A protein has these predicted regions:
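Non-cofactor substrate-recognition interfaces
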Residues: 1-138
């Protein structure tokens, strides 16, 4: 079956979102601290940016002091082109350079996805939210 890594404090919310029954569908294999996950590689949910991969850097778990367990899964995706905290975390961890010239920006000036993200090309980022969520559930 599927394996998930999630914040213990968020398990009830996540189980509800995934329509899972804790007693019937869930087996907790291991309990870890967030710091235990730092440096572990993961498979990105979409492969749009594989050509930008930097082995040992991209798609590895990072640590950031602004990530909390009071909402979502307790894990945060980094988008350095769309937020100062993400940008600083990615620079600090060598994902992108400080000048940002190697940063991937798949959105145009109007806030629409470019051809780098084929299924959502031309869609405004907010219009694409539902489709992205649906695709993530698959």
């Amino acid at each position: 079956g599927a394996e998930y890594i999630l914040a213990k404090d968020r398990k009830d919310w996540i189980y509800k979102c995934l329509k899972l029954n804790e007693k019937k569908d869930i087996e907790v294999e291991e309990t870890l601290l967030g710091t235990d996950l730092v440096g572990i590689p993961y498979e990105p949910p979409f492969d749009f940016f594989k050509k930008h991969e930097r082995p040992g850097k991209t798609w590895t778990v990072l640590s950031a002091d602004y990530v909390t367990a009071d909402s979502g899964t307790g894990l945060v995706h980094q988008s350095p082109g769309f937020g100062e905290d993400d940008y600083q975390t990615c620079v600090k961890n060598g994902i992108i350079s400080k000048d940002g010239t190697d940063m991937n920006l798949p959105v145009d000036e109007a806030g629409r996805f470019t051809d780098e993200v084929p299924p959502y090309k031309g869609m405004h980022v907010k219009e694409a939210d539902k489709d992205i969520k649906d695709d993530l559930k698959k």
